[in-house]
Amino acid sequence: MREYVLIFLVAPVFAAILGPYDIPPELPPLNDENFFDRSHSEYETVLTPEDFELGTRITAAMAHDNGDDIWDSDAMYSKDRFEGDIANDNLNASTAELFANGGSGKSEDGKWYNAIKNRLQLWPEGRIPYTISSQYSSYSRSLIAASMQEYASHTCIRWVPKEAADVNYVHIYPDRGCYSMVGKMGGKQSLSLGSGCIQKGIILHELMHAVGFFHEQSRTDRDDHITIMWNNIQAGMQGQFEKYGHGTIQSLGTGYDYGSIMHYGTKAFSRNGQPTMIPKKNGATIGQRNGFSKVDKFKINTLYGCPVEGEKPTTSAPTSGPIVITVKPVVITTGKPPVIQTVSPAVPLKPSECRNLRGDCDDLAKQGWCIRNPGWMRANCPISCGMCIPTKETQKPYVQTTTQAATTTARPQKPVTQPIQPLPPVPPLPPTTPEDCEDLRVDCLVLVSQRYCKISQNFMKSYCAKSCGFCFKPPPTEIPDNRPTVVTTRPLVTLPPAVIRSRSPAPPVSTTTKAAPTTSTTSAAPYSPTPLPSECSDRKHFCSHWKSAGFCEGIFMNYMKKNCPASCGLC
């Protein structure tokens, strides 16, 4: 049954990624090969901006499925792990209290909930360094990126790429099944997203374990809200349905949440296909894997001392969708001397609109993405790029030397969290051709230092060809022209006769023609404006969309120059 649901969900996703002109005749079979390749050499890497862009489009495509992404996976219910997917060593119902805080106690209302109490097991300032296995496919990386984006959008939890100074971090890799440790355990801790786990709701679930949460149905007050059908539980698995004792978990002032993404499904550990848990509230459903409930968001923000969003949302208005602005000179060619009209620099964002939507914005700014793709960074990381009107509540951005001075502001003690609308889908990424020979990953230099140019040549030729020195330029077939080339930052323009005659001619190309910097003319022919070259036209359907998304600059500039020169003004 799960395979049919997957086909229903993924079909529109492939259509959204490929576009209306590139839909394949039939989808590939949905198996593990679509999600990861365990035969590939395994090493630690991080997500890229392209993963987050693709994740946004996949999420938008799935939104058209009317929220039917609710199926629960058997991969979450391992007989060998505590409660099916908790990987902490020697953790069970009898040791959970000792694990959480080593003592006993009682909340004010006598109830215990599902967050750890020991503050040492929380991630400092909500910053969670991570690495991700190189074995995941682009589709899987994008869903993981979309899930991390959910945390950045609704909580102050920031999943950030691991840095050299980070000793404690989460490594995500495709082991057998789905599992995670609860909270920060110290050092490198594993989080598995293997077979049956590449689904956004399950990814959110496992990441929330790492944030510091147990399952909802293990609360002390759970018997007031659900009925456990003990006769339907697999033999020996009754211990997976124990409740936590006093002193084990944190009181966060919330009622029982049937809709929590941390709740078991109705048939967890079932021996006969019948429900093992039944809600006592009429019409309530459990085990949803659509996304955070309002209470989930409230609990995460409360546990980490963030401005609260969720069950008690803030009253600030949501921001509008990101506006991608590409500043390009506009050239008007007439019979008069040319007039260059330039668009004024992008207006700094208002404080109400200025918020980093990703946890790794500072890292991306340091890697130069504010310059390489300013449109995308303005929409996702305006604070880090200094694109905001300075206020006391604005974080300190990473300051770069650009044509527009960055605004330096003060970093607050705690990030300001505001509810926002889901990001709109972005246009498809332009494909990268081998002849462009550009690095397509931001961590290429790191991979080069780890000798992957030798041990994984095929992978590095595809993603880090420039850093590895795999770029190939064919020998010239014509005699090169050694005359100096004038490089200008302004587009080619056609000049009137008076301006042309005032310029000194370039060295003659033939006995009958004289070359000028921008216009060719003969001594006998009357003046006429030189038309644009016939090949200066867009060759792709999505050129205008790619331009508005900022792809005329950065790593895709060579591709856009070849395929979308008219839209990008690169003729």
UniProtKB/Swiss-Prot annotation:
Cofactor(s) of this protein: Zn(2+)
Organism: Caenorhabditis elegans
Glycosylation sites: N92
MF terms (GO), sorted A to Z: metalloendopeptidase activity; zinc ion binding
CDD domains: ZnMc_astacin_like (cd04280)
Signal peptide as annotated in the record: 1-15
Function statement: Metalloprotease.
Residues holding Zn(2+): H205, H209, H215
Tissue specificity remark: Expressed in pharyngeal marginal cells and muscles.
Protein name (Swiss-Prot/TrEMBL): Zinc metalloproteinase nas-15
